[in-house]
């Protein structure tokens, strides 16, 4: 009898190597992401002590400007170099113009540059270089003094610079998203404030209205004369009284004739002329107000 062993599935070497490669790639990607996050969290470096000790390197062009005719080295001048130097300056000016316009559009301020400028000015003051520069200034002519403005007329630009600095500092601060909950709370608070204002305005209107002062003065007080005058061309209407019939008696053969009022009849006390009636009506209308 031949004993057969059980067959088990075995992983191939290729599949194991592929899995190892995938795991290594995942680990590498995670490490790169963490490095990028760390680089973003890094604070920018300020002014280093080594840069302050070494100082700025003076370029050759600045030395040429200080001694353009090379009097210290014998007075030999190379005209080709002078022409090339002028061409380079034009290109540098264009580049500088583009850079300044871009920095003005971003509205951000380089704090390190301001710090370096402040340190340089303070060092010059301590060394006494500023006093020498002030002495180098040319004396002004009498005509130049005429164009100068007195101090009381000069407009101080300190306020403008302070406003510019504050705007630049605020533009550099990144905005933080507070979330949806904060926005919803702000909306609810604004709606409540609107409702309060509307309620206050309505209450003020109700308090201002009183029975003594009418709301519409024109309706209550304007009385036009056309309501008091009678129509001129209107036909005159008179109430004609029908004649009263005489009572019949026994033995009367003729028809009873209507009674005629005597010519000089006295009027009762209730009867008045139309002028008196309108006059009394006018007086009553004015008494109401």
Curated annotation (Swiss-Prot):
GO terms for cellular component: chromosome, centromeric region; cytosol; nucleoplasm; spliceosomal complex. The modification Phosphothreonine is found at residue 253. Residues 1-30, 85-111, 232-289 are annotated as: Disordered. The modification Phosphoserine is found at residues 15, 17, 261. Keywords: Centromere, Chromosome, Chromosome partition, mRNA processing, mRNA splicing, Nucleus, Phosphoprotein, RNA-binding, Spliceosome. Residues 5-58 are annotated as: Interaction with SNRNP200. It holds the Pfam family Hep_59. Residues 232-283 have a biased composition (Basic and acidic residues). One of its GO terms (molecular function) is U5 snRNA binding. It is found in: Nucleus; Chromosome, Centromere. The modification Phosphotyrosine is found at residue 147. GO terms for biological process: chromosome segregation; mRNA cis splicing, via spliceosome; regulation of homologous chromosome segregation. Its main location: nucleus. Belongs to the TLS1 family. Plays a role in pre-mRNA splicing by promoting usage of the upstream 3'-splice site at alternative NAGNAG splice sites; these are sites featuring alternative acceptor motifs separated by only a few nucleotides. May also modulate exon inclusion events. PPlays a role in spliceosomal remodeling by displacing WBP4 from SNRNP200 and may act to inhibit SNRNP200 helicase activity. Binds U5 snRNA. Required for proper chromosome segregation. Not required for splicing of shelterin components. Component of the spliceosome. Interacts with SNRNP200; the interaction is direct. Interacts with PRPF8. This is Splicing factor C9orf78 homolog. It comes from Mus musculus (Mouse).
């Amino acid at each position: 009898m031949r004993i057969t062993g059980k067959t088990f599935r075995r992983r191939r070497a290729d599949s194991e190597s592929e899995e190892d490669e995938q795991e290594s790639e995942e680990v590498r990607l995670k490490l790169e992401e963490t490095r990028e996050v760390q680089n973003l969290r890094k604070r920018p470096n300020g002014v280093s002590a080594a840069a302050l000790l070494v100082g700025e390197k003076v370029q050759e062009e600045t030395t040429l400007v200080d001694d353009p005719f090379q009097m210290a080295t014998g007075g030999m001048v190379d005209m080709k170099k002078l022409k090339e130097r002028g061409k380079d300056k034009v290109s540098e000016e264009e580049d500088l113009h583009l850079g300044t316009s871009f920095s003005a559009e971003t509205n951000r301020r380089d704090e390190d540059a301001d710090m370096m400028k402040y340190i340089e000015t303070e060092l010059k003051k301590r060394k006494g270089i500023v006093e020498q520069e002030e002495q180098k200034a040319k004396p002004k002519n009498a005509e130049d003094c005429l164009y100068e403005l007195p101090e009381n007329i000069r407009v101080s630009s300190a306020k403008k610079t302070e406003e510019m600095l504050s705007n630049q500092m605020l533009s550099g601060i990144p905005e933080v998203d507070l979330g949806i909950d904060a926005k919803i709370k702000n909306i609810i608070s604004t709606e409540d404030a609107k409702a309060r204002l509307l309620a206050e305005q309505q209450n003020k209107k109700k308090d201002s209205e009183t029975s003594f002062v009418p709301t519409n003065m024109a309706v209550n007080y304007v009385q036009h004369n056309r309501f008091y005058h009678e129509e001129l061309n209107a036909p005159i209407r008179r109430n004609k009284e029908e004649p009263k019939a005489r009572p019949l008696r026994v033995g009367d053969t003729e028809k009873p004739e209507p009674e005629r009022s005597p010519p000089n009849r006295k009027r009762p006390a209730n009867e008045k002329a139309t002028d008196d009636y309108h006059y009394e009506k006018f007086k009553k209308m004015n008494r109401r107000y």
